[in-house]
Amino acid sequence: MFGVGIDIIEIDRIRKSYQTYGDRFLKKIFTEGERVYCFSKSNPYASLAARFAAKEAVAKALGTGIGKLLKWKEIEMRRDSRQPQVVVPEALLCSLGVKRVLLSVSHSREYATAVAIAE
């Protein structure tokens, strides 16, 4: 195992950020596919918060944080199956010696959380 990352966020924080900054906030953090998926849900803020937590958890598991080596939109969470899939630049994974990143996300009424394992 290379690293483990975990994150938790209040769903209301994402809602307030969207209400304050609008699409500018969304376009900085989330890919177009993530935005489309989340706004197709009955509670888009819970889905957005889960993806935000996932991005933070992945960055922690890789040990890069969000910044020079890894940008927000370079981490994309997809729902191709029942299990969430995470897409990260292959070149970065190779340079770190990471073969894959596993991801688990969940949310309640107030919080979203994610755990990432880099192997």
Curated annotation (Swiss-Prot):
EC code: 2.7.8.7
Cofactor(s) the record lists: Mg(2+)
Residues noted as binding Mg(2+) in the record, renumbered to the chain: 7, 56
Reaction(s) this enzyme catalyzes, per UniProt: apo-[ACP] + CoA = holo-[ACP] + adenosine 3',5'-bisphosphate + H(+)
A cellular-component GO term for this protein: cytoplasm
Nuclease keyword on record: no
Main location: cytoplasm
InterPro entries: 4-PPantetheinyl_Trfase_dom, 4-PPantetheinyl_Trfase_dom_sf, ACPS, Ppantetheine-prot_Trfase_dom
GO annotation terms (biological process): fatty acid biosynthetic process
Broadest EC class assigned to this enzyme: transferase
Keyword check for Nucleotide-binding: no
Keywords, sorted A to Z: Cytoplasm, Fatty acid biosynthesis, Fatty acid metabolism, Lipid biosynthesis, Lipid metabolism, Magnesium, Metal-binding, Transferase
GO molecular function: holo-[acyl-carrier-protein] synthase activity; magnesium ion binding
Localization terms from the record: Cytoplasm
Domain of life: Bacteria
Gene3D superfamilies (alphabetical): 4'-phosphopantetheinyl transferase domain
Pfam families cross-referenced by the UniProt entry: ACPS
Protein task: Transfers the 4'-phosphopantetheine moiety from coenzyme A to a Ser of acyl-carrier-protein.
NCBIfam families: acpS, pantethn_trn
Similarity comment: Belongs to the P-Pant transferase superfamily. AcpS family.
Protein name in UniProt: Holo-[acyl-carrier-protein] synthase
Record organism: Chlamydia trachomatis serovar L2 (strain ATCC VR-902B / DSM 19102 / 434/Bu)
